[in-house]
């Protein structure tokens, strides 16, 4: 049996956490031969609820679970963590402006960045799911100077999967027959779902759909899918977010299929003229536990404009919290 991997999850008693933990425990994220130790973090008032989640995890008697710890202290939950899923975040309350939300989360993610810096494995892979995910990831990264900045990522795999599903519905293809979708930019309504390089059953996607549908239906549907789910369900997307977090980590650790890429929000290295340092979603290939941004894709005028609009939002978000960053 392999040595267990330590997986830290914040906000572990929340809706996404509840959908996530049982999938991790059953081997969906790291493989059916990889034991895990779950290190669960919650705020103090939620520890009792977390106890109930742990009871359920125990009652499943998962063969791959080597241990479970719970804590309301980030340093304890992140101790020697190999993977950290930062799910817990301050939700947007009534009357809160985006700036208020950014500042409220800056405090949380600064503290978590410091705790990761002090306690986690030096190779820890960090995925931020809690919104605003891209900038929360940047805040954590800037507070963890001793860790590799490239190991701080944010989730746009949910947007990627949403885009694949929309294109599958439109073309009548199965989602497995759709390759090389791209989400550029922020996990927000400015993101740019790009089908210009996408293949459906080996055929170029742009030739299979009307341009009008692409620009005026597909793009806004993907951008606003989260809001549509809240409207329909009365609660935000939790199971689909958890599933996409599992996809993101699985591909990062175990690799993307040969000849295919996925979408990951990663620290920009200036690729495609995007400002360095912001956490921006790019097409990425993963192998040997590392990722690379796909280079040399041709960018037309329409795409360039959309890519810059979402970049602008990320720069504004960074600037709004810059005074709180080390």
Curated annotation (Swiss-Prot):
Class of enzymatic activity (EC top level): oxidoreductase
Entry binding sites for NAD(+): 11-17, 105, 112, 129-131
Gene3D superfamilies assigned: Lactate dehydrogenase/glycoside hydrolase, family 4, C-terminal (3.90.110.10), NAD(P)-binding Rossmann-like Domain (3.40.50.720)
Binding site for substrate: 92, 98, 131, 162
Domain of life: Bacteria
Keyword terms: NAD, Oxidoreductase, Tricarboxylic acid cycle
Keyword Oxidoreductase: yes
PANTHER family from the UniProt entry: MALATE DEHYDROGENASE (PTHR23382)
Name this polypeptide is given: Malate dehydrogenase
Lineage, highest ranks first: Bacteria, Pseudomonadati, Pseudomonadota, Gammaproteobacteria, Chromatiales
Encoding gene (name): mdh
């Amino acid at each position: 049996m392999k040595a267990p991997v330590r997986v830290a999850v914040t906000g572990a008693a929340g809706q996404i956490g509840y959908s996530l933990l049982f999938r991790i425990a059953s081997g969906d994220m790291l493989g059916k031969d990889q034991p895990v130790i779950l290190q669960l973090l919650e705020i103090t008032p939620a520890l009792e609820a977390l106890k109930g989640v742990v009871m359920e995890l125990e009652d499943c008697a998962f063969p791959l679970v080597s241990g479970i710890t719970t804590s309301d202290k980030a340093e304890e939950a992140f101790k020697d963590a190999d993977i950290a899923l930062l799910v817990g975040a301050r939700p947007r309350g009534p009357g809160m402006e985006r700036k208020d939300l950014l500042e409220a989360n800056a405090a949380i993610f600064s503290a978590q960045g410091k705790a990761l810096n002090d306690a986690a494995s030096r190779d820890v892979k960090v995925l931020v799911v809690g919104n605003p995910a891209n900038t929360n990831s940047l805040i954590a990264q800037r507070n963890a100077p001793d860790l590799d900045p490239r190991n701080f990522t944010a989730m746009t795999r949910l947007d990627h999967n949403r885009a694949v599903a929309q294109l599958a519905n439109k073309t009548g293809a199965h989602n497995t027959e759709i390759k090389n979708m791209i989400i550029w930019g922020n996990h927000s309504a400015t993101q740019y779902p790009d089908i210009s390089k996408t293949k459906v059953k080996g055929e170029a996607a742009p030739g299979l759909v009307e341009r009008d549908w692409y620009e005026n239906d597909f793009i806004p549907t993907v951008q606003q899918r989260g809001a549509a789910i809240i409207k329909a369900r009365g609660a935000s997307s939790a199971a689909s977010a958890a599933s996409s977090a599992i996809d993101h980590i699985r591909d990062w650790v175990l690799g993307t299929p040969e000849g295919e890429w996925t979408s990951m929000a990663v620290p920009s290295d200036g690729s495609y003229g995007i400002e360095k340092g912001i956490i921006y979603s790019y097409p990425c290939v993963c192998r040997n536990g590392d990722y690379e941004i796909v280079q040399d894709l041709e960018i037309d005028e329409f795409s360039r404009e959309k890519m810059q609009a979402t970049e602008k939002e990320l720069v504004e978000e960074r600037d709004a919290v810059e005074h709180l960053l080390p």
